[in-house]
Amino acid sequence: MEPLPKSGTPKLTREEAEKIVKNKLGAEAPTPVLIGVRGYYSKMGVEGKNDTNIYDDAIIVLGKDYQTFNANTDPSFVKKEGRALSFIKEGVYKFAKGKHKNKYNALRAYPEGVEIPCVRDGKTSTAQYINIHMGGEVGKDTTWSEGCQTVPKRQWNKFIELVYSEMNRVKAPTITYILITNEEMKKILG
């Protein structure tokens, strides 16, 4: 299965993104902000199922500039070496600039080591050291995630440069990340 949608990047408009932010953060919401939509491409993979290891999700950068990107908000696998991986729960989180595995620019959950609510094997849990980082595009572990949020390699540089630029523009040490489901997005947008 092709890990990226054939239709290109998500088609969510700026106005729709602003409506989501207003719903989740209120009228005086700060910008820039990131919006993650789990299951944005509901017909990609198994229809009606939240798939792993494909870019069937979306991540939106809303600030002075606006851009949508393909994304993955799930781990590449349900388990790795017998260990249940984390599916981050929908919610509002803070991220800061940082390195992924000390190798390249990424976003790291803030404050460092914060416990983020997640589900592992259907059980409520928490996860630490969640990043938004570059994913892969081919192979067995396409999205390169053990619970982090990932953007395809071919879109990564444009994504992270835009996010860092938006954060620098307003001198923001952190950026808000809203994670919702496709179903919640549809309810908000009416």
State where each predicted segment sits.
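Local cysteine-cluster metal-coordination motifs and their immediate loop/turn environment
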Residues: S145
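Cell wall/extracellular polymer interaction/catalysis modules
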Residues: M1-T142, N157, E161-Y164, V170-I175, ...
